[in-house]
Amino acid sequence: MRRSGEDVFGGAGLSGIEVQYVEELFDGANRVGVGGHEFLPATADAAGVASLEGVPHQLLLADAETAKDVLTFLGRATRISDEGVRLQAARGVLALTGAALAPHGLFDQTPTVLAMRVVQVDPELECDVVVSSLTATDDDSALTLPETGLSPAWAGVAPPRGHWQPTSTLAASVIARRAQWGISAVARGATPGSGEEAVRALRAAIWGEPDEDLGGLPRGVAFAADAFGFISGEEDVPVMQSGRWTRLAFRRGHVLARGPVAAGLTAVRGTGSAQ
């Protein structure tokens, strides 16, 4: 049985078929099925809410620790935004994706930065839904889905299925330091009485800015790694690229950022600038 903390996107503890499935996950949301039978929830309303009536309402996970892992990821995601977590499952693998940062509206310059973690699930479960909550049950290894799902815009922006090319590595300590710098900058800039739009613009400016210490990636990748608990001790984090997307493969999960194609990413030194 795979431990829930292992690196699965890179292949640790998974068969070749499972790895291939994980890299083909990003294709369509709001589908749920069991045993090969697919169910389609109702179309989302104007508020982005989709009914899950008539679909299986339980996730059967590998064990109690995996269920706790899923709830922890969801809890971290809900502290960041109210746009839920995407659950994509098939072939015994469940990928959880949350948006650390995502634009709201045409002129919002916030980058799309996603966090992903993968765990084992009931091999017969097939699903692709976005939910804002999951509920523990009498079975420690099972979680109950809510009655309704969500349809956030970020869930329709799919990372590529494959062709990830290694470009560099980043020291986890540097990523952590840049995250703390950004958090402090947001706190300093958000004056009392700042409106929602002003705070959003401030966050977009700070987290969306390319950071030299992160190889030119938006500083938001550091925020995502910190907020979702992916940084743990010393680690050289592989950086991979596919088209407009960049992926940071931590041992605890993955951060994916969408933006202009970055050329010439190089390994970053172990010390960061104070800025």
Q: Residues of each region from the PLM?
A:
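Actinobacteria-biased recognition of intrinsically disordered, low-complexity terminal regions
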Residues: 1-60, 65-68, 256-275
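Long, compositionally biased intrinsically disordered terminal regions
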Residues: 3, 9, 131-275
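Residue-level detector of functional hotspots within protein domains
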Residues: 5, 11, 71-73, 80-82, ...
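Short amphipathic beta-strand/extended segments with alternating polar/hydrophobic composition
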Residues: 13-17, 97-99, 105-117, 255-263
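A sequence-level detector of short, solvent-exposed, charge-rich linear segments
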Residues: 38-44, 89-93, 115, 169, ...
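N-terminal ordered "arm"
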Residues: 50-111
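A broadly used, surface-exposed interaction patch
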Residues: 105-142
